Design a protein with these regions (language model features):
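Gly/Ser-rich "nucleophile elbow"/oxyanion-hole loop immediately N-terminal to the catalytic nucleophile
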Residues: 69-76, 121-164
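The feature captures the conserved acid-bearing segment of alpha/beta-hydrolase catalytic domains
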Residues: 176-253
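N-terminal cap/lid segment of alpha/beta-hydrolase-fold proteins
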Residues: 22-75
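Short glycine-enriched nucleophile-adjacent loop
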Residues: 163-172
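Alpha/beta-hydrolase-fold serine-hydrolase catalytic core, especially in secreted/extracellular enzymes
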Residues: 235, 244, 253-301
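Short beta-strand element of the alpha/beta-hydrolase
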Residues: 74-85
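Short amphipathic alpha-helix adjacent to the substrate-entry channel of hydrolases
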Residues: 92-110
Length: 301
């Protein structure tokens, strides 16, 4: 793909309408997913999940353990904010994926449309607003989450255009790790007009470990994802290409499928020190390293 098309290509469908679809990028390419038959199933955690509007913030939605008695005495409750594909303001499309992650003991947040608001795309400020909300909610009298959120353990993850947002948020001192699914950045082109999306110049500002995942050859962002991994030289990074997964991969499989397992294990290992989860990524015999369906690389892991 020509470099000038990469940013446009990841402006995918927003509630069924393509904001940008440059020559060579078809809807079929955008929607290519791993066939469901025979695919690994999502592996939920021990917590039953409830989802609800964020108190006082109608543009945000929360996925969290229904019962919070275990937090923080027996378990920590880190925060993960999700950036949607197409930078769509509609995290409910990913509810299965986000619910699986939350079920492992995480507070998960995403954006939702506000009734009567002008239609627009999700941006980095929306992700920051979710972190701001969690900080306030952790101190709000009457909040079920008061004193329970592990604000020193904040992640931002996103898919496609949402992956751009996660890279941008990697510079926020509150964000300790990022996940970039089916996305990545390139070196800025000489003379190119300013873009709202990050370039490789954003990578040195990322200060925590990076998870980079793509859908291998059927994913038109494969080369960009790999190039992004190669350009990271200041923080640990793990790169994985799931064979035959395509650009949409498994995020819309029941419970988010294999992608949800990878995201959950990354967070469990990074924030909760779960060695079994970390075995997916650590060492030459890591479970993804020895899985014939994956091509992987890592640095500093």
């Amino acid at each position: 793909m020509h470099k000038t098309n990469v940013a446009a290509a990841v402006l995918l469908t927003v509630t069924g309408v393509c904001f940008a679809q440059p020559p060579g990028i078809t809807r079929e390419m955008i929607e290519r997913a791993l066939p469901l038959e025979g695919a690994p199933l999502a592996e939920p955690g021990p917590y039953k999940i409830t989802s609800e509007p964020a108190f006082g913030s109608p543009g945000l939605h929360v996925y969290r353990p229904e019962t919070l008695d275990a937090f923080p005495k027996k378990d920590s409750l880190p925060l993960m904010v999700w950036g949607n594909g197409g930078c769509a303001i509609d995290s409910t499309r990913y509810s299965g994926f986000l619910t699986t992650i939350a079920s492992h003991g995480f507070l998960v947040m995403g954006t939702v449309p506000v009734e009567g608001a002008a239609r627009r795309q999700e941006n980095a400020d929306d992700i920051r607003a979710a972190i701001d909300w969690a900080e306030k909610e952790n101190a709000r009298t009457g909040s079920p989450l008061i004193g329970k959120i592990a604000l020193d353990k904040v992640a931002v993850m996103g898919q496609s255009c949402g992956g751009f947002l996660s890279i941008m948020l990697g510079a926020d001192p509150r964000v300790k790790t990022i996940g970039v699914f089916n996305s990545g950045v390139q070196k800025p082109a000489a003379g190119a007009p300013p873009s709202p999306f990050p370039t490789a110049d954003a990578l040195p500002k990322v200060h925590g470990p990076v998870l980079l995942i793509n859908g291998s050859d059927p994913d038109f962002m494969l080369a960009t994802s790999l190039a992004t991994f190669d350009m990271i030289d200041n923080v640990p990074a793990f790169y994985g290409a799931r064979h035959n997964a395509g650009h949409t991969a498994t995020v819309f499989h029941p419970g988010g499928g294999e992608y949800a397992n990878v995201a959950s294990n990354w967070l469990l290992w990074t924030f909760k020190g779960d060695k079994q989860a970390g075995a997916m990524f650590v060492g030459k015999n890591c479970s993804l390293c020895t899985n014939p369906n994956w091509d992987v690389k890592s640095k500093g892991i």
